[in-house]
Structure formats: C-alpha cells, structure tokens
From Swiss-Prot:
Keywords: Cobalamin biosynthesis, Methyltransferase, Plasmid, S-adenosyl-L-methionine, Transferase. The keyword S-adenosyl-L-methionine applies. Belongs to the CbiD family. The gene is cbiD. It comes from Thermus thermophilus (strain ATCC BAA-163 / DSM 7039 / HB27). Its EC number is 2.1.1.195. One of its GO terms (molecular function) is cobalt-precorrin-5B C1-methyltransferase activity. It is an enzyme of class 2 (transferase). This is Cobalt-precorrin-5B C(1)-methyltransferase.
Amino acid sequence: MSHPYPPPRDKKGSRIGFTTGANAAAAAKAAALALLGEAPEVVDIWLPAGWRQPFRVFRLERKGDGVLVGMIKDAGDDPDVTHGAEIQAFVRFASEDRLEGGEGVGVVTKPGLGVPVGEPAINPVPRRMIWEAVREVTERPLAVTIAIPGGEELAKKTLNPRLGILGGLSVLGTTGVVKPYSTSAFRMSVVQAVGVARANGLLEIAATTGGKSERFAQRLLPHLPEMAFIEMGDFVGDVLRAARKVGVEVVRVVGMIGKISKMADGKTMTHAAGGEVNLSLLLSLLKEAGASPKALKEAEGAATARRFLEIALEEGLELFFVNLVRLAQEKLQAYIGERPFVSVALTDFDEGRCLAAWPDREVYRG
C-alpha cells in the first residue's frame, strides 16, 4: 500500500507488514533529508529483522523551520487498528537531540512499560530506530516529533487506557515488521499489562480469555483492583512467563469451556489456529463424572465444548467441571513451574457463574 516494492512474504505467502515504529523511523529520515534540501519520494531504513526496507513518502510539507513527513502504515496481511493510519514525523534542527510525542501519541502515566512516566509512549526499539535512521542523514542535533492523526480515537480500541497510556497510541515494534496472523501487537500489550500490574505493587492478577470473561472475573474476584484484570485472549503461556519474569506470585485464569478445555489438553496458546478442542478428552471427563448412558451417547455426537457444558449442567455433573479445571490447572502449573501459583476458574456463558475452580474455589464469589 505505501511501499514502492512488494513487501516480503512469509513461507505461507502472506504479506509481511511494517510496525508503527518502522514507519516513524522512515518518516523521520525523510524529514531529515528534506531539511538538507532534498525532496525524497522513497527512503530506506535498516530493520532489526535484518534487512533494509524502502518506504514511500505519503506527505512532505515544509513548515516554518522544520519539515513534516507522513507515511501510511501497511500492516500487511495481519491488519491491526493502525493499518492505514498516517504516521508522521516533524523534524527540525535544535540545540540538542529531543524526541517528543505529538497528536495521537499517548503519554505513559504508570511505571512498568520500559518508558519513563511522563514520556511519550514510544518504545525503546522504535526510539533507537528513529535515531539510527536520522543519523544516516546528519549528525546535527534534531528535535523529532512523532504524531498519529486520529490516534487518540484509535487508542480506545487497544489496551492502552488499561496500561496507563493516555491520549493516544503507542509507537511499537521490536523487529520493524508485523508477521501475518501473529497478533504480535496484542501479545506485546498483554505482556506489558503484567509488567504494569507488578510495577504498581500487585502480586496477584486475573488473566481472562476475553472481554466477557473479564467482566465475570471482576464480579468473582472483587478483592482485586481493576489493574489486576488482564484480558489475555489466547496468550496464557505468555502471561505466565511474563508473571514469572516480573515476580507476580498468583495468576488466576478465568475463562469459558472452550479455552479452558484447550488448557486442560496442555495448550498454552488457545487460538483456533493452534488446534481444535479435544472432544475425546471432554468425553472421558464426562464418563469419569458419572454421566448417564443417554448423556454419553449424546456427547459422542457433540461438535463443540459448549455442548458438553450443557450436557453436564443437564445431568448435574459438578465433578465434570471440577476435573476439567483441575486438569487445566495442573497442566499450566507444570508448564510454568512452582511460581507463579496458578488457579483456574470456569464460568458459564451467560450469568458469569463460577462452575468450578481449582485449587481454591473458596476465593471466587458466586
């Protein structure tokens, strides 16, 4: 979309995209070139992924003593909320190097993000990329302002408000590229959320598999502050590793039967691409719980984990739910080791009722 040459493709043929940070670095380099009298239509920068990548200039405007350049972000075949957004850099000569955030770039208000509180939410790798890019052009001190028009509105669709990044988006990226279907930005924000919780003194967090699960978890665990609740999606393994790294002592995993069933099957990435629910496992748990022959026959034809939940409820088989969460907890605890302590709770779909939790059901209200 914004590049003069086709972006690279992965082994499956999907287009690789480029991070907000890579676009910001390319925009800053183009603006620095324009400060020296050039009018670049294309600039290339070095990506941490290991190659030089050209970027096409979308906007170049001389304003006062500086130059504004805009690039259109192309996230490839894994579009995120910033796909198609304009990433701008305004660059001018200064007495010393300064990197600032402009319109649509958030400000860090809580510790734990790797960026000092009060600074623009431009992560360490993009910061380095920006300065390396402009240093290819000039050694003179520069003031660089990164902006994302419309970023404040786009940020409402991200985890930034929960992370304490206010007023706009984060400038992210560790490699400069967005791998198709990696959901790398979301994964990174989930890991950051764990770090923010710990940096603000929390030793116990609740990791939920979705927005609905999070609402249920907040009712089940009223002793936890809002910051402790982290919507992890499919990334339970990432949450546990992040918790271990920063010293979180307790992780309470709260979810519905589809995701919890995958955890019970030993999966630490529960996206559909990571495999289907093991219905044979659920059938064996139903048998262990004492299901009637009629229920077992119906379960043998079931196509979803939800149907197993319905059958267990109809039969009054609380043991099915207990054994399921116990198995999930044991698999997750074995995966991460002794610390953090892992607790798993299963809710229904509609009322947020806790059907079972292991090993400390008494902690969960309802």
